Each structure stands twice: as structure tokens, then as C-alpha cells.
């Protein structure tokens, strides 16, 4: 039980730190499982999805006032209504692709080699976009054009490949479509709510039989750790990228992916 608690804490930290950074939480969790023997077995694979609820609630807590105002104004405020529609439009491509190909993707692509290559390629793309002399036209994540929301949602679908990063894909697309860095990051947070909630509900439905009393305690520990870590990371991340951009995270991806490939090639 103690070993399981330690695993839950470590994986909760990994989830909370990486979920909203453009570095791929799924990729990092898969690498943690492969190289440190963390999270082997069906329960632990479900655990990695279930503790995402902690990260989702972190966003709801941080943006509660803004999201509550939008919810209240959905039927009276055209801007609030447009934003809600925009989030749904952005979420739709991932919902369709996930339902159609999710099982295939998990079966064939969820392995450390794919993760490492995706980390490196995604890091190179993030570094390239971060250094472009882009002229932002949109500075409010709740006021993008509807077509922009849709294109961001399409880009997010690439993150079904482990190692790509859901937030990274949506941030890169948003910046190329004319948003500034802060609003690109913020919208990736908002888009995470329906996307991750959908994955959470689906996985809970499929694997509820594995949820024994002991397992629920382990999930609860991972959930709390993920929530607290995500709160700290999101607040720090927004301040950092506004001032410094995404270069640090791009290099992080490249270094982790390269070290992972070396370790795999050596049979570690």
C-alpha cells in the first residue's frame, strides 16, 4: 500500500506539472511507466486518466469568477454565448476523432518510441513558432473568431498521438492564427475542460469495475496532488510565457525526447 501511495504522489505531481504545459502529460506519464516502473497494469493506466479530474478542477478554481459570469450570461450576453459555442466548436473535432479512432491510437501508438519522437518534433515546431515575428490580432481568449476556435480544435486532434501535447498543439495553432501567447495559453486551459472531462467520464465508465476501496484511496491521493500541483503550475506558467515565451518548454521536450531515445536504444 505504501508503494502504491508513493506511486500515486509521483504520478500526481507529473500530471499536475505537465498537463497544462506544452510538454505532453501523457507522454511523460508513459515514460515514467517505462523507465521507472511506475503505473504498470490496467488500474494504473486508468489512474493516469482519472487524476486528470484534479487538473480540470484546478482550472475551474482559478477561473471560477470568469467562467461563472460566462455561464450566467450565456442566454443574455452575445459575447458569452459566442465563447461557449466557440469552446464546443473547438471540442467537437477531438470528440469525433477520439470516438472513431481512440482505440486504434491507444493500441498502436501508445509506446515510448512514439512519445520520444513526438516530443522532439513537437519541441522543434514550438521553438520555431515561438521565434517567429508574429503580429497578434487577438488578445482575449474569450473573443476569438469562431473559425479560429474550430481550427484550434482541429490542431488539438494531433495530440491524440502521445508526446504531441494537447496544450502544445492548441497553443501553436492559436499563435499561428493570430493570438498572443497569453491568450493562446489561456484558451488551451479552457479547451481542456470539456476535452479532459470527456476522457475522464469515458475511462471511468469503461473501468469502474477496477475501482476497489483501496484503489479509490489511491486515486483520491493522486487527484489531490494533481490539483494542488496544477494550481501552482498554471499561475506560474502564464506569468512566465507572457514575459519569456515558450523556448524553455521547447528545449525541455527536445532534451527529454532525445534522452528517452538514447535510453531505449541502449535497452534501458
From Swiss-Prot:
Gene Ontology process terms (BP): cell wall organization; peptidoglycan biosynthetic process; regulation of cell shape; response to antibiotic
Main subcellular location: membrane
Pfam families xref list: BacA
Location(s), subcellular: Cell inner membrane
Keywords: Antibiotic resistance, Cell inner membrane, Cell membrane, Cell shape, Cell wall biogenesis/degradation, Hydrolase, Membrane, Peptidoglycan synthesis, Transmembrane, Transmembrane helix
UniProt membrane topology term: Multi-pass membrane protein
Protein name: Undecaprenyl-diphosphatase
Species: Rhodopseudomonas palustris (strain TIE-1)
Gene behind the chain: uppP
Amino acid at each position: 500500500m505504501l508503494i502504491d501511495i508513493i506511486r500515486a504522489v509521483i504520478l500526481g505531481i507529473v500530471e499536475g506539472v505537465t498537463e497544462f504545459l506544452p510538454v505532453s502529460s501523457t507522454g511523460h506519464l508513459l515514460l515514467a511507466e517505462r523507465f521507472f516502473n511506475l503505473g504498470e497494469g490496467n488500474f494504473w493506466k486508468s489512474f493516469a486518466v482519472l487524476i486528470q479530474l484534479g487538473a480540470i478542477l484546478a482550472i475551474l478554481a482559478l477561473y471560477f469568477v470568469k467562467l461563472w459570469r460566462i455561464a450566467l450570461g450565456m442566454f443574455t450576453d452575445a459575447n458569452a454565448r459566442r465563447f461557449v459555442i466557440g469552446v464546443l466548436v473547438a471540442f467537437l473535432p477531438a470528440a469525433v476523432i477520439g470516438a472513431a479512432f481512440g482505440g486504434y491510437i491507444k493500441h498502436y501508438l501508445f509506446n515510448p518510441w512514439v512519445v520520444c519522437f513526438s516530443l522532439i518534433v513537437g519541441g522543434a515546431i514550438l521553438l520555431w513558432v515561438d521565434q517567429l515575428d508574429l503580429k497578434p490580432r487577438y488578445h482575449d481568449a474569450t473573443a476569438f473568431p469562431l473559425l479560429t476556435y474550430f481550427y484550434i480544435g482541429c490542431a488539438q486532434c494531433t495530440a491524440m498521438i502521445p508526446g504531441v501535447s494537447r496544450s502544445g498543439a492548441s497553443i501553436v495553432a492559436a499563435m499561428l492564427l493570430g493570438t498572443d501567447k497569453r491568450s493562446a495559453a489561456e484558451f488551451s486551459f479552457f479547451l481542456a475542460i470539456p476535452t479532459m472531462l470527456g476522457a475522464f467520464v469515458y475511462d471511468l465508465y469503461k473501468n469502474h469495475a477496477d475501482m476497489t476501496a483501496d484503489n479509490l484511496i489511491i486515486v483520491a491521493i493522486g487527484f489531490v496532488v494533481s490539483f494542488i500541483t496544477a494550481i501552482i503550475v498554471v499561475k506560474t506558467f502564464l506569468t512566465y510565457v507572457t514575459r519569456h515565451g515558450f523556448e524553455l518548454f521547447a528545449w525541455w521536450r527536445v532534451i527529454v525526447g532525445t534522452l528517452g531515445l538514447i535510453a531505449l536504444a541502449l535497452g534501458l
